[in-house]
């Protein structure tokens, strides 16, 4: 091999990238061991043969044996020497290799030299880097020369070592006693420890991050491109997509220019083919910038879709410069979803990675975390193997540095905790018993038995007659109505001296009226009549001409106008009373008879010829004897549990009709004593030993729990992966969650991602969030984008910006923190265009305002200037200037009302101080209202200045029971609070402890959400700061139910534990020796039973309840036998009986009898039928009904007619004009003067009045009768009979019958006449003895294994035990809550408690109650410090201030009740 033609990248990689000297070192050790074994074998063989020849074996045969053995002995000695030489040469080659490796140039230095060259070339715009480039190239040439010289020397040295080795000679044949392995000893040949490169050098490109052949430039994808960012072939320029393009940002083939889309274009921004000229700054659609082609690009010279930056030619959604792939963030990336510079692989976070899923730089493998790793899944630097943690490892699955084998440097532990056996020795002698059964007395049992005989059968079904069914349907007190008619209004009717207009009467609606009919024996029926409507339209009324009072009147110029109405009829409505309705329906249904002549199903002919037979069979032809049964059983396990009669067993009652005279008893049994039973037991054995295995296997990496091996630290999930704290498969980096598809970077959640803090699928950059979930590719790149298929900075789905300057903002262009809205300056605002903090609304300047366009603090409403201005009852106030005003358009302080100017006025339109009333001017008093102390207070019971509510202490409070300055709400302690029961400053919400909270029940500051403990939380029930979601514990979390920082998903960062503690089986060995018995049972005598019985009634039912036998654990080893068992005769002597019984027995019920299957082999021939079903006739059902009753009386009350208003306007225009006046002056002047208009005016009068009220008198309709006879009957119905003709039957039958169950049956009572008399004789059961039984028991078994499951579920927060999820620490009760140590629902803060069954809502520290804030308060609706309510937890106390005890108290140290 000519090493001089190879660059240093290849020569250094060949030395450093292979297995190293480890295999050759192992070979040297193996050869040395073989040499020692051969030398030992030669010495042993020589010793044995010499001893035989010289001592125990003499003669010619021994000499012949010695001569035969000599060649083999010589061969063993020569082979041992030759193996030792091989070991020496192998060690020499290891030393040669290590010397070469130490002299070679490190690959990292070569890569750094080339990287520096690329950087200098790209920045050498004006030739300023020429000296540095020359120096870099000179250093590179020196590296080349060093590598060539070292490799040449290594080749010479390795060749010399190899040439010194000689082949082994074959051993002599036909000596079967020689070890067989010597015949198979290999002739080892030492080869150089040189490995080939892992890939094939076929790129021949000059530049950076090129993929393809013949490239010159950077980030090219294809062949023969000159320039940068060109995917395709033969392109010259930047960012061209296609082939044979010259220029910038062209899409297509053969284009010359900038931003052209198509083929063969020459110019700028042309779209189409073969065009020339200037088309525009961009081609394509939706592009913003210069020379872009494609769709939706922003920047300069981009092609593709949705790219942001300069010269991106990738297919879609790149952010940066010169990216040719998809969804990349950075510079010159040719892959997919990379974050960094010059990555040709996919999903990398870093620079110049050829592989995929890498976090770091210059990794040619995949899923590495670190630098210069040619292998895969490595964590560290320069690892050529796979799944290594460390540096420069050429093996696999190793931890450390410079390992060349596999599974090296792993740390594990394996051992067993053994508890030794514990001895068991129990010796006992004793007995069981005696057992005494006391006397048992059975009292007299009375019997009554009477029987008079009975017959069973025949059974006839008589006709079944259904008698007449009476129908008594009577209605009394039925009502129709009442019917209510609402008021009827006629619209106004214009009144003019002309025809009237059409009069329209609006629709008249009649509402639903109840209809209740009560029927005798039938549930009352409630219905209704209506609703309905009546539309009435009156035509044009005709009014006759008005006769003139005198000629010419009324003149034409007189106008009469006005109106009549509106007219309202029935102004109070109209009610038509209920109409009585009584209906009496009589009659009946039936009678009718079913089966009047009975019904008989005739016999069904059945002819079957059965051939075959059953039997014969003999049971026990020679008798049967059961001999003694030896018993030797090793029984382990347990018996049971099992349940006899799981549902119980009920024996139905047996009717017994017997009249027996006499009685039985009383019976007394004597005491029965069982003597003591001797018992002797000797127990010995042991418990244990107990072995608890402990094994912690050594695995790659440190602290990994992945299913498949991983490198790095504390990785979990499927594996393999690299890095630190990653979850999933195929990933790299730090604290990423990837699933099974892999990712890279830092704190990313989702597959195929790179960068930092991204959430989604196929996302690169910083803090981007996909809305498509983790299963769908989002193609995101850039910074802070939310949605999908976006590139750039802080963009959303609508193409707008999400840029905010601050934390936890939800909106656009906010300056501050935790704002919900747009264009806010400050923190904790809900709305837009606010300047300040804690405002709810739009356009306010200040803090704690609710509304819009307020300037100041704590205002409720709009356009207020000042602080603590509000409307009545916290309604919206408008246009107040000042503070503490309640109302609108007030100027000044503490005014209550509207339009006041001054201080402490109560009313409207006042100008002055302390005025009460309306439109007054002056000075009324220092305070208005009542019970005020101080100056310029209005309202009641205030102490201080400029207070306008009730019961306030302080300055400028416009709410009630506030302590402080400028509070608008109720029971606040602090400054400028617009909500209720706050403790702090500027809270627009309620029940907060802190400042500037727009939400409710927060402990902290600037929380727009509710029940948070902390700061700047937009969500609810968070513990921490800047959380947008709900129930989080931590900071800057936009998801919900999570613990930690910057989570965007739900249920992230939760800690739980689940495992099983297994205790293996514990050996148990017990030996029991002893015996039981003998057991002696003495004679048992049952004395005579006097009989005098009188039996009445029956026996039963007899119910046997469930019988449960629990499990019986067994672990026995029984040896021996049982039997034979002999039961001696038991004789019961005759019992004389003398009875006289009259009565009967029965009925007797026989339960189901089950017969098991019987094997049969039958052939059935014959037929079935005919089957005839006769007609079935249902006779007619008579029907006779008679409805009697009446309707009425009906009473219609009077209809009132309301007054009709009438208004007439008369207008008479008057014009006064001086007519023409002729004149003639001495014939000199002739003419006229005028006409001269003097005046024009109107004379008018309005006539108003109306008609008088009137009405229509009511009337009544007398009752009238109702008689509806209904009679008849249904027609008879006959179901025709039918017949089934005979049909043949030829069925071969074989097999067996199924189990047959004979249903139970009943035997009717039958007569009994049996004379019974006398009594029973005494009965003696002879005693018997059970001899003693030796007891020898050996029990071997164990205790366990015992599995103890341990499962600690994960939940939001830490140590919470609330019923519903909570954030924070150690909260308990119903929840949800936030904070530390709270008990109950809706709580924030520390150590607060809501009593059981209350709705909650508490903030602060050490409060007990509900709807409270502050510190150490007790009660309902309390703020401040150490206040106590005396009205319990269910009643609002409205306390504020410090150390008050009572209700409606404020200020400091007040007892009792306030105003």
Curated annotation (Swiss-Prot):
Pfam families: Pentapeptide_2 (PF01469), PPE (PF00823)
GO CC, alphabetical: cell surface; extracellular region; plasma membrane
GO biological process, one term: symbiont-mediated activation of host signal transduction pathway via agonism of host cell surface receptor
Protein location: Cell membrane; Secreted, Cell wall; Cell surface
Keywords assigned: Cell membrane, Cell wall, Membrane, Secreted, Virulence
InterPro entries with a match to the protein in the record: Mycobac_pentapep, PPE_dom, PPE_sf
Function: Facilitates a shift in the ensuing immunity toward the Th2 phenotype and could aid in immune evasion by mycobacteria. Interacts with human Toll-like receptor 2 (TLR2) and triggers functional maturation of human dendritic cells (DCs), leading to secretion of IL-4, IL-5 and IL-10 from CD4(+) T cells and induction of Th2 immune response. Maturation of DCs involves PI3K, ERK1/2, p38 MAPK and NF-kappa-B signaling pathways.
Record text on subunit structure and interactions: Interacts with human TLR2.
Family assignment from sequence similarity: Belongs to the mycobacterial PPE family.
Protein name per its UniProtKB record: PPE family protein PPE34
The species this protein was found in: Mycobacterium tuberculosis (strain ATCC 25618 / H37Rv)
